[in-house]
Amino acid sequence: MFIDNVKLVLSSGNGGKGAVSFRREKHVPLGGPDGGDGGNGGDVYFICDNNTHTLAHFKGKKELKAQNGQPGLGRNKNGKRGESLELIVPQGTQVIDAQSGEVLLDMLVEGQKELFLKGGKGGLGNTHFKNSTNQRPDYAQSGVAGKTLSVRLELKLIADVGLVGFPNVGKSTLISVVSNARPEIANYEFTTLTPKLGMVEVDDYNSFVMADIPGIIEGASDGRGLGLEFLRHIERTSFLLFVLDPLRDMSLKEQFCILRKELEKFSSKLYTRNFGLMLSKSDSINLGEEFAQKMEDDYNELKAYLQSQNNPQSFFIKVSSLEKTGLKELKFMLLEEVKKIRNQNNL
């Protein structure tokens, strides 16, 4: 099950209580204090793991707590430290304060380990309180309480290329033929109900990650359809590929303008991201001469519009996933854009 948003109450462990104890030996009737310290409470850590792809393992868990420190013992034996709580999360997980909305942690790197909540310090045993005026202190410190915080874990998939389009335009088919992803494919809207990642291998030495998200509809940025819930997954994609469908009831230009508008309303950063355009189902030109002419007119209308906007796109290509035409060219075009962005990020 794909889960990308959970709420949790996290607590570090309480420090153990220091011991009040005195030496008990046969020939020492009034032995001095020998109370050990309480153990520190366990910490709470977040660990980034690429082998984990969802937050589903937190489903049904509302409160998670590290172990408390053990109390101190006699004979100057300290209590055992509480076991820390290590929370394994996928790459791209944000830890957000549930009240303020502040992003507290951003887990981006494989193996990244972050201390989130420090455990309470263990209390001192009565040994520490012996002095010249009090040789037998009968008190010790209580342990310090751990910390508690309500958080929201939010997963944003990290990919090089994000597919953007209306439902049932061919995004899932595309990612299934160019990558190792195997999404459900059917001829009805919202087949893709969860985001999918696929590795696209261009040749023996070059590859990139592609993300397919549920289709966006007009009003997605205002909460309509499934789009709003998953739009955040393309926030971390380096390059966007708009997938346009000649078989829809609206023109290619209308599709493009609505999709761009929804991205702009959701995030100004997404709106300014580099993008390419792909006309899917180009094999539908075989549906008849009249349709072929309409499709060509639509295509030329969008090209003219893009030209009037100073061609903001990196490329515009026709592809048929069914007939596998244009796929090789598309992969190399996308790789070129991904390489440009990677090089810029390394400067």
UniProtKB/Swiss-Prot annotation:
Its main location: cytoplasm. The keyword Secreted does not apply. Residues 159-339 form the OBG-type G domain. GO terms for cellular component: cytoplasm. Its EC number is 3.6.5.-. Transmembrane segments: none annotated. GO terms for molecular function: GTP binding; GTPase activity; magnesium ion binding. It is found in: Cytoplasm. One of its GO terms (biological process) is ribosome biogenesis. InterPro entries: G_OBG, GTP-bd, GTP-bd_Obg/CgtA, GTP1-OBG_CS, GTP1_OBG_dom, GTP1_OBG_dom_sf, OBG_GTPase, P-loop_NTPase. An essential GTPase which binds GTP, GDP and possibly (p)ppGpp with moderate affinity, with high nucleotide exchange rates and a fairly low GTP hydrolysis rate. Plays a role in control of the cell cycle, stress response, ribosome biogenesis and in those bacteria that undergo differentiation, in morphogenesis control. Monomer. Belongs to the TRAFAC class OBG-HflX-like GTPase superfamily. OBG GTPase family. This is GTPase Obg. The lineage of its organism: Bacteria, Pseudomonadati, Campylobacterota, Epsilonproteobacteria, Campylobacterales. The gene is obg.
